[in-house]
Amino acid sequence: MSHVVVKNDPELDQQLANLDLNSEKQSGGASRASKGRYIPPHLRNREASKGFHDKDSSGWSCSKDKDAYNSFGSRDSRGKPGYFSERGSGSRGRFDDRGRSDYDGIGNRDRPGFGRFERNGHSRWCDKSDEDDWSKPLPPSERLEQELFSGGNTGINFEKYDDIPVEATGSNCPPHIENFGDIDMGEIIMGNIQLTRYTRPTPVQKHAIPIIKGKRDLMACAQTGSGKTAAFLLPILSQIYTDGPGEALKAVKENGRYGRRKQYPISLVLAPTRELAVQIYEEARKFSYRSRVRPCVVYGGADIGQQIRDLERGCHLLVATPGRLVDMMERGKIGLDFCKYLVLDEADRMLDMGFEPQIRRIVEQDTMPPKGVRHTMMFSATFPKEIQMLARDFLDEYIFLAVGRVGSTSENITQKVVWVEDLDKRSFLLDILGAAGTDSLTLVFVETKKGADSLEDFLYHEGYACTSIHGDRSQRDREEALHQFRSGKSPILVATAVAARGLDISNVRHVINFDLPSDIEEYVHRIGRTGRVGNLGLATSFFNEKNINITKDLLDLLVEAKQEVPSWLENMAYEHQYKGGSRGRSKSNRFSGGFGARDYRQSSGSSSSGFGASRGSSSRSGGGGYGNSRGFGGGGYGGFYNSDGYGGNYNSQGVDWWGN
């Protein structure tokens, strides 16, 4: 075989030249100056420069004067980390996340008003919109409004909360407000307050909102169900809307490309449990509706990869449990360099659960601004002296706020203690549930996980629609159980202490302590699940010889709350006190004076008219506390049930808690 070199003749060269893609003929009249540049087929009938002139770095057309929040149907700059599309200001074309389960049923939702973003990976820290005025509301969304604001009520005794005493100690305390309109919180916050149907602030909100708006540190003690969450979310979000993202925005942009950049939240809220963290996050969703603030939540027991992906889309307000937050910080996903607001909710519970090392790691041993630069708030139902002393390390010239009988219980809760042997508890429980009917939510507390499963099985086989939660359940199972309970599909929830703290389950009519806790503070938080925000509630506790260690504290608590005290409980408390005293450290002194917590900076012998007279002893003469209750609240359960049932008449016509 021979190899012949064939040279191109002039005719072949001419044919190849005629195939020039940049010739005048094929480019539709393009200028000769553009010769040498390849033009895609779909642009060959346009001007050579059209489609390339005003492009961003990703290659997609992007009008610079176009609002990133109002782009119906336009390409969404996929791959460009600093820009995202909103898919329209109305409902057309908006991504609907119904039926999708993120975070095992909670959290991470692609939602307008919360950082509208595509799931292709766009950052909430967008180049254009974040430089706009953060105080201006974004367009509304009817679907999102329905999702966020479709439940809840103010409670039949909400107006009575005005009688609750309040004491604030500290230098230069700002005056309290009477209505939300008394202080400027901006258009977005006021609009969301109307959507939540809040008619007037609760006592803790009246005092905490102006304190936080005045950029003062705060330690607040308030009874459960008093509106603590809104008390810190409203002023913090209001300040973020007013001040904008500040240096945090620049830090995120300079930190790296999408997928590797660290997020710098402006506000951090720490909570002891994942349930409470999710609850705070859902409240933050409400109050950040139609704003550019994007809340996020991270907690243990859920897919950390999904949480990281959610964080990478941007985070301005972060709600977290301490353990998972430390994990995120060590992974380089969260930086606290520009955190202006720190909130510790249920602070005593976090310390009881052993989170103090993680809290100190977060607050003192990382890059968080020091006290005096950041603004720190502590909220809890109880604040004993030990925790107040710890607060010296986190708070700077703080104001101590005591609202209601902190560490005690609300008089909206009727408490009943009955003697029940262990073998009789299940039959007693059936009697109670049979008298209650199926239209009210009942929360049953037990001490062990095995006991929760066993009792749920028993009630199920007795024909009751019930569910249960405890620490061994997966996050998905726990969320599903809470959803079934809240919706009324399973009106009976059996729970261990994991559900006792901070959960805001509205309309819980009855709390039953099937097993009493060994700690009186745990008892306070358990029964605080009912009677929330002015609603009337009922708490029944099964007592026997196993619970003798809390006899004295329980008696003091019932006396202070003007509840009916069984004679056998008084006798047991007397005998127990004079036969060697209470086993373990008595905590009854925490409830003296009506509030249960005092500012340790004040003299231990001082008193305040806001607290009422100190009880001093277990006398039932009515010292301390608040309200104008007569005797022990008018006898019985005030008509909750129409059955004689057990331990007294449930339909007593005596004087109610408010003297009616």
Swiss-Prot record:
GO CC aspect terms: cytosol; nucleus; P granule
Enzyme category, top tier: hydrolase
Motif (Q motif): 178-206
Catalytic activity: ATP + H2O = ADP + phosphate + H(+)
Ranges for domain Helicase C-terminal: 412-573
Residue span of motif DEAD box: 345-348
Coiled-coil positions: none
Subcellular location: Cytoplasm; Nucleus
Keyword Hydrolase on entry: yes
Residues carrying Omega-N-methylarginine: 100, 109, 590, 615, 630
Annotated disulfide bonds: none
Record domain Helicase ATP-binding: where: 209-401
Chain positions with N-acetylserine modification: 2
GO BP term, pick one: gamete generation
Example GO molecular function: ATP hydrolysis activity
Positions carrying N6-acetyllysine: 55
Keyword annotations of the record: Acetylation, ATP-binding, Cytoplasm, DNA-binding, Helicase, Hydrolase, Isopeptide bond, Methylation, Nucleotide-binding, Nucleus, Phosphoprotein, RNA-binding, Ubl conjugation
Ligand binding (ATP): 198-205, 222-229
Top-level taxonomic group: Eukaryota
Family: Belongs to the DEAD box helicase family. DDX3/DED1 subfamily.
Record's subunit section: May interact with TDRD3.
The protein's name in its UniProt record: ATP-dependent RNA helicase DDX3Y
Originating organism: Pan troglodytes (Chimpanzee)
Lineage of producing organism: Eukaryota, Metazoa, Chordata, Craniata, Vertebrata
